[in-house]
A protein has these predicted regions:
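Long, low-complexity, polar and repeat-rich extracellular regions
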Residues: 1-176
């Protein structure tokens, strides 16, 4: 899927469900906001073996207004730089926290931001994340990361709620 702006795939209502498997998504802003996967208004996206490539200023995976995104197997998110938004939730008054769950081998170049949402990353062996993290704990939101035989190259100041490591490395030297 190639998106020259807006989004690659989106679930925009409470009855909307998008199921994807073995899919590559490339997002180019063309001057406006662009998102690889976008769930909102109670929409739900499930994905298995996805690759998302985002141009500068794009967002990889984004959930808002009580929506949910569940991803399994291999997940590649390659933003233009590690400070770009790879995975994020957004708080909106009057809505329950949105949820993003990912479990599998992950290659992430970009940051993970839990802003009023719940993000759970279960990184299987061979996973590499280069970027930063933020959890603002608004609306009951949190960011939990489990890493097994994986590497996180921390590129800037970061915080999260839970970090469980098994034979994994958190490389603070990547922060410049």
């Amino acid at each position: 899927i190639f998106s020259g702006g807006s989004y690659g795939a989106s679930a925009q209502t409470a009855t909307a469900v998008v199921n994807m498997q073995n899919t590559d998504i490339t997002v180019d802003r063309n001057g406006s906001l662009a998102l690889g996967l976008w769930a909102l208004s109670g929409g739900r996206i499930t994905g298995d073996s996805l690759a998302i490539t985002g141009a500068a200023g794009a967002r990889g995976i984004y959930a808002m207004t009580n929506s949910q995104i569940d991803l399994t197997s291999d997940l590649v998110i390659d933003m233009s730089t590690p400070d770009q938004m790879a995975i994020a939730t957004q708080h909106d008054d009057g809505y329950a926290a949105s949820r993003i769950n990912a479990s599998g081998r992950m290659l992430i170049n970009g940051s993970v931001l839990s802003k009023g949402g719940l993000i759970n990353l279960d990184m299987h062996p061979g996973s590499v994340w280069t970027g930063s993290s933020l959890s603002d704990n608004v609306n009951g939101g949190k960011l939990d990361v489990t890493m097994n035989n994986s590497v996180w190259n921390v590129t800037s100041n970061s915080n999260l709620d839970t970090l469980a490591l098994s034979h994994s490395t958190v490389d603070f030297a990547s922060h410049t």
